[in-house]
Amino acid sequence: MPTINQLVRKPRQSKSKKSDSPALNRNFNSKKKKFTDLNSPQKRGVCTRVGTMTPKKPNSALRKYARVRLSNNIEINAYIPGIGHNLQEHSVVLVRGGRVKDLPGVRYHIVRGALDTSGVDGRRQGRSLYGTKKPKK
């Protein structure tokens, strides 16, 4: 327990909040070849590998993911939500934050219906998250 005098000399420091998606908080200046801190809600990237991953216990599935090189030259793993996708190796994708709890090392989601990523076909409910247009009557 510190004394009042110790607290006057050096007050308590508040805990600093660590970012859940650190790759979206850096910006690369290619002219100066330096990183700068600049928060962004999404970033554009190019797929370098598309594959499947098995989740942690007790779940069992083949979750689709893509390894993406972002526009700031950082490589990340991003989850591909929804049933079926059209992504290949050089597809350009939009990446947002948001982890997948049962996939270790996957802290980002790919935005469906943006850039080269198509929306989920035949989806009728919860279409907004999956980039699906309103079906014709």
UniProtKB/Swiss-Prot annotation:
Region (Disordered): 1-55, 118-137
Entry's Gene Ontology molecular function annotations: rRNA binding; structural constituent of ribosome; tRNA binding
Biological-process GO terms, alphabetical: translation
Domain of life: Bacteria
InterPro entries in the record: NA-bd_OB-fold, Ribosomal_uS12, Ribosomal_uS12_bac
HAMAP family from the UniProt entry: Ribosomal_uS12_B
Protein name stated in the entry: Small ribosomal subunit protein uS12
Source organism of this protein record: Staphylococcus saprophyticus subsp. saprophyticus (strain ATCC 15305 / DSM 20229 / NCIMB 8711 / NCTC 7292 / S-41)
